[in-house]
Amino acid sequence: MAVSSGTSGMLATCLFMLLFATMQIYKSQLTSSQPMAIVGGFLGSVLFILILTAISNFETHFFGRNFQTKLIPEVVIALVIAMAASGMVHRVCITTCLIFSIVALYYVSRISIKVHGSGAGTATAIPVTKGKKGK
């Protein structure tokens, strides 16, 4: 069952805070070995998707259905926040968060194009015809 964009934004924000707190609580376990540091980066990419969802849904709620999330500033801001949150756990988590987030962004964009149609509209030239000025 679908919820409104405002409710979805609040859910994504709450899940972001919950996951961020969980990463901080289990910081020592996430830094104990290299595979766990990679898991920390993966959790950081989940943070990225949650932040991006929250930002996009709040923009849709406040600016209307036709508003689209752009690469700059929304995606970049979400990526910086997720990488900073991952950096609070371990340095390696920053790199793996970036890699996993780029892959996740590709698949989210692919799903969005499939569901909603063309992602970025192409500019089409309108032919200019010479006619009488008095028309």
UniProtKB/Swiss-Prot annotation:
Q: Which Pfam families match?
A: Keratin_assoc (PF09775)
What the entry lists under InterPro entries is as follows:
KRTCAP2
What processes in GO biological process is this protein linked to? Answer: protein N-linked glycosylation
Alphabetical GO CC annotations of the entry are: extracellular space; membrane
| Taxonomy, superkingdom | Eukaryota
Q: Does the keyword Membrane apply?
A: yes
Membrane topology, from the record: Multi-pass membrane protein
Which keywords, in A-to-Z order, does the entry hold?
Membrane, Transmembrane, Transmembrane helix
Membrane spanning residue stretches: 1-21, 35-55, 69-89, 93-113
Where found? Membrane
Under the subunit heading, UniProt states: Component of the oligosaccharyltransferase (OST) complex.
- Name the job this protein performs: Subunit of the oligosaccharyl transferase (OST) complex that catalyzes the initial transfer of a defined glycan (Glc(3)Man(9)GlcNAc(2) in eukaryotes) from the lipid carrier dolichol-pyrophosphate to an asparagine residue within an Asn-X-Ser/Thr consensus motif in nascent polypeptide chains, the first step in protein N-glycosylation. N-glycosylation occurs cotranslationally and the complex associates with the Sec61 complex at the channel-forming translocon complex that mediates protein translocation across the endoplasmic reticulum (ER). All subunits are required for a maximal enzyme activity.
Q: Which PANTHER family match?
A: KERATINOCYTE-ASSOCIATED PROTEIN 2 (PTHR32001:SF1)
Family per UniProt? Answer: Belongs to the KRTCAP2 family.
What protein is this chain from? Protein KRTCAP2 homolog
Source organism of this protein record: Ixodes scapularis
